[in-house]
């Protein structure tokens, strides 16, 4: 049997052409559709995977937010309890301080009232003692006491400082009169004694001298001329006694 090589090659060529046609018109579109479908499936799978990951992430975030909210709630509750306790303690402390302050103020007022009462009482006693002493001296005044008062006043005139004498003797306006005020009437002898002391001490140049009785002066003598004043009596000693008693009874 003879082989027809031409036929063989023709069949092979036909087969190759058929394969090419099949591949080009049948397999390639099928492969393209399959590739496209596979790409769509892969894309859908990736989308599903992404959605699942997003869902998982959202769920995880939700759990985290829940935990954060729980922690914040616990923190807020703890802070509220702490603030309430602190406010209660502050109010209790304020109440105690107010009570203590009121108590101290009441005690201070009580002590102040006690001190004021005893201070007033001591002052009244001191003033009464001095008043009794003044009245006793007035009641006991006699000729001997009057003589001693006049003598002390004349002695004070003799011991005036040069500055005092200069001030009295060189007044801008000469005095029209000299007034001698006493708590008791002076007899002629005592008046003459005082006039003599004034004449030897001051430059009065015939200025009239008037004697005036003022019982309120107590045991003392007061000289006044042109605004100048010379005083001697027991009142300064009694005033000093009153001040000493006032200081001692504070």
UniProtKB/Swiss-Prot annotation:
Q: Which CDD domains match?
A: ATP-synt_Fo_b
Which GO-annotated molecular functions does the record name?
A: proton-transporting ATP synthase activity, rotational mechanism; proton-transporting ATPase activity, rotational mechanism
Keyword set includes Nucleotide-binding = no
InterPro entries for this protein: ATP_synth_b/b'su_bac/chlpt, ATP_synthase_B_chain
Q: Name one Pfam family in it.
A: ATP-synt_B
Task: Give UniProt keywords alphabetically.
Answer: ATP synthesis, CF(0), Hydrogen ion transport, Ion transport, Membrane, Plasmid, Thylakoid, Transmembrane, Transmembrane helix, Transport
Segments traversing the membrane: 2-22
Location of the protein in the cell: Cellular thylakoid membrane
One GO term describing the cellular component: plasma membrane-derived thylakoid membrane
Q: How does it sit in the membrane?
A: Single-pass membrane protein
Q: Which family does it belong to?
A: Belongs to the ATPase B chain family.
Assembly, in brief, is: F-type ATPases have 2 components, F(1) - the catalytic core - and F(0) - the membrane proton channel. F(1) has five subunits: alpha(3), beta(3), gamma(1), delta(1), epsilon(1). F(0) has four main subunits: a(1), b(1), b'(1) and c(10-14). The alpha and beta chains form an alternating ring which encloses part of the gamma chain. F(1) is attached to F(0) by a central stalk formed by the gamma and epsilon chains, while a peripheral stalk is formed by the delta, b and b' chains.
Function, as annotated, reads: F(1)F(0) ATP synthase produces ATP from ADP in the presence of a proton or sodium gradient. F-type ATPases consist of two structural domains, F(1) containing the extramembraneous catalytic core and F(0) containing the membrane proton channel, linked together by a central stalk and a peripheral stalk. During catalysis, ATP synthesis in the catalytic domain of F(1) is coupled via a rotary mechanism of the central stalk subunits to proton translocation.
Per its record, how is this protein called by name?
ATP synthase subunit b 2
Q: Which organism is it from?
A: Picosynechococcus sp. (strain ATCC 27264 / PCC 7002 / PR-6) (Agmenellum quadruplicatum)
Q: Which gene encodes it?
A: atpF3
